Curated annotation (Swiss-Prot):
It comes from Nitrosomonas europaea (strain ATCC 19718 / CIP 103999 / KCTC 2705 / NBRC 14298). Residues 74-94 are annotated as: Disordered. Residues 85-94 have a biased composition (Basic residues). Belongs to the UPF0337 (CsbD) family. InterPro entries: CsbD (IPR008462), UPF0337_stress_rsp (IPR050423), YjbJ_sf (IPR036629). This is UPF0337 protein NE2439.
Amino acid sequence: MMGWNTVERNWKELKGKLKETWGDMTDDELDVIAGKREQLVGKIQTKYEIAREEAERQVNAFAHDCDAAKEPLKNVGEAVSSRQKSVKKRSLYT
């Protein structure tokens, strides 16, 4: 599962997805938040006038969705890496 540290490290790449999820967020607000989970939760809570628990739930769902989207790519990467190792082994024996 993608931890929040991974979301934070990939913040710039995820900005588009963040804006899709929370359309009222500005680029400037997202730049200030810069991947800090508690700041994102607080901003969602105040901007959308929702309970903190709901903001937490939304942020957790976002991280989970990012995780689910990256999982197939991870599997493809592992398959490619495995295939490359297999090809290298065969070329050593030919």
